[in-house]
Amino acid sequence: MSMTHTTPLVPKNVAIVPAAGIGARMAAGMPKQYLTLGAQSILGHTLDALLSHPQIAQVIVALHPHDDMFLGLPQAKHSKLLTVIGGGERADSVLAALAVAPQDAWALVHDAARPCLTHSDIDKLLASTSEFPQGAILAMPVRDTMKRSDDTGVINHTVDRALLWHALTPQYFPVAELLTNLSAALNAGVVITDEASAMEWAGVFPGLVSGRADNIKVTHPDDLHLAGLFMAHLSAKPLVE
């Protein structure tokens, strides 16, 4: 009797969360992703948004090699979650996660310290591949008047904001292409501030998908209070808003 062997389906979408940073600018005595925001940690909120999305098959978290807090999170044993050891810089952590991701999947790379992510923003990004097959990022048009200074802190000139955007996360690219381009950029000594900058360096120009203004990154102490206000509002409504 012959037997039919089936190959497990490779996930179409994986989320990558670089969480190996120490958050020095917060001066909080612990990595900022573990600071409490409402009922749980910042990282806990971030993981909840990703793990609960039905079109994300796996979430890969890159951790500091001496992280002793992650296993205390309720999400740590989730069946969709995988951890890897991250690197000294964000790009190194993303590279480590990409190396273990399915190479024919797409990766949503999301900051650990952006806890207010909604499913509606994820949905918009996932749906963007028809318009932007090269990949895309969540972003927000600049609203304020932008000034460029000189090196003494004096205004040099006003920048036209008409075509300026704030880059947010997630940033969404094919795993294999992002892995190749990010690795090549780092080997060339290029300073990589986000995944889109690695793709731009390689001659790939990502699309811009307008995201929510409350998808903020907790970087400074004041951000924690603001994120708390946003999270309180989101907690009263579903993530799909």
Swiss-Prot record:
| SUPFAM superfamilies assigned | Nucleotide-diphospho-sugar transferases
Q: Which Pfam families match?
A: IspD
The protein's Enzyme Commission number: 2.7.7.60
What are the alphabetically sorted keywords of the record? Isoprene biosynthesis, Nucleotidyltransferase, Transferase
Q: Which Gene Ontology BP terms does the record give?
A: isopentenyl diphosphate biosynthetic process, methylerythritol 4-phosphate pathway
Q: Top enzyme class of this protein?
A: transferase
What chemistry does it catalyse, as a reaction equation? 2-C-methyl-D-erythritol 4-phosphate + CTP + H(+) = 4-CDP-2-C-methyl-D-erythritol + diphosphate
Protein name, UniProt field: 2-C-methyl-D-erythritol 4-phosphate cytidylyltransferase
What broad taxonomic lineage does this protein's source fall under? Bacteria, Pseudomonadati, Pseudomonadota, Gammaproteobacteria, Alteromonadales
